[in-house]
Amino acid sequence: PFVEYWADFMPEAPRVLPQDDLGLTEGAHDLVIHAMALHWADDPVGQLVQAARALKPDGLFLGGFFGGESLTELRDVLRQAEIAVMGGLSPRVAPMGDLRDMGGLLGRAGFALPVADTLRKTISYRDIFHLIGDLRDMGETNVLDARHRAAPPRDLFTRADEIYKTTYPFEENRIRSTVEIVFLSGWKPDASQQKPLRPGSAQARLADALGVTEF
């Protein structure tokens, strides 16, 4: 759905489905948007490097993806329920990169003027089954190679729902789920871009500009 969303804004722009090789022409694009797929990439640095190479000088990269704070409640209740019902643990929610780690990848990929920011939202659901159904409809369920292949026992999710409603309640007898979206931006290096000053080379004091006393 995200590919079609951007197609409404830029119908003539080439669109690439999530895959290891993005197939972008080197140095051919003014803008590359990596929309809500970087958290699934096996090699996120490689994805960013490909995007950087595809940009013209002073071209802009924009990225958005689910961050590490997403689904923290679901991870916790599934962990508790699995220990109680099955006596062990297995990865049931895929790990996602946090803001600091993913922001640092921009510099490694060769982008100038990198910026990383995050947006957190709380969404409520009737129960864990509606939450998991929403994830399934979005194509965001567990695809880890190390996941359990056998169908889990029904009472695992029944127990998880009980824990969820007790531990993370929301208004009107609902449950809450955190969603974090990390946003990245970076520019293809170009001589025309502003450069950071050398440390200690400032000609004016910030305290003077703000009209405050420096301690």
Residue ranges and their predicted role:
Residues 9-12, 46-48, 76-79, 129-130, ...:
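Short, glycine/charged-enriched secondary-structure capping and boundary segments
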Residues 45-60:
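A short glycine-rich, Lys/Arg-flanked "PGG" loop and its adjoining helix->strand segment in the class I
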